Amino acid sequence: MVAVPFVKLKVLSPILTAMSHSMTRGLRTLAHHERIAFGAWLVTWISTPIVLWTAGEHIFPWMASLGVLTQVALSVGILARTWAPFQLASVAGKILISAWAIEVVGVHTGLLFGRYAYSDVLQPQLGSVPWLIPFAWLMMLPPAWAVAAAILSDDRPEGVQRRSHLLARAILAGAAFTAWDTFLDPQMVARGLWQWATPGEYLGIPLRNFAGWWFAATLLTAVVQPKNVPRMPLLLVYTLTCILQAIGLGIFWGQPVAALCGTITMGSFALMAWIRESRRWKYSSGP
């Protein structure tokens, strides 16, 4: 009875060790200004439960907004390594406008995600959609792009990669982005930030919602066609988002099922990406 977990641990140990080493390298690659943004983001996430306990639950929208904006600053700052300012502004603008339009259509028609509505907790709103929501798309799409790039990269120059390969990366990025929603939706519904007209199959969330997220994120990625994405630091952001969400939902917010499901879905993408990245680093560094 004891041997089975021991064998599993023995198999997973080198994988987790390689993953931790890769994450450490990812942290070391952060520039000075990126480390400031990283620190601000991490402090915001870690301090949120403490602030809510001391100041009250009414502070949550402010802490959520601060968490989103600090992660946007971090993700966009990392992209600025390899992207020209105009390209960065153009892509960010496309994501913000497209995400807002998708949400407006979703709220008013029920297409893509099913029938849902935002409460008045998050303000201000435009077209019944809180202004913060498009920024949440912007904060997590780049890390999802890094996951797809790490898993599927064939190390050829991105300009000569086949269209089928770019499409596969868009599909995988959409799935990695959707995995984050297995954490997000149960938490925000429980806090009354939005609600569904008819409770669905996954902790009250319709499965159709996740299909809509995957389709929308895949479409956005295919349109933007992000290239030269700094993989390792954005993988670090994706992985830490998974870890922090798992701890938050599992320990502080009393949602262990969402914590487990999110860890499995989002963690699987992170693990696959880090395995590929660690192998790539090992082969490039030689014996």
Model region roles, listed by residue range:
Residues 14-287:
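Aromatic-rich, lipid-facing transmembrane alpha helices and their immediate juxtamembrane interface loops
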Residues 1-18:
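N-terminal amphipathic/basic-hydrophobic helices that include classical n-h-c signal peptides
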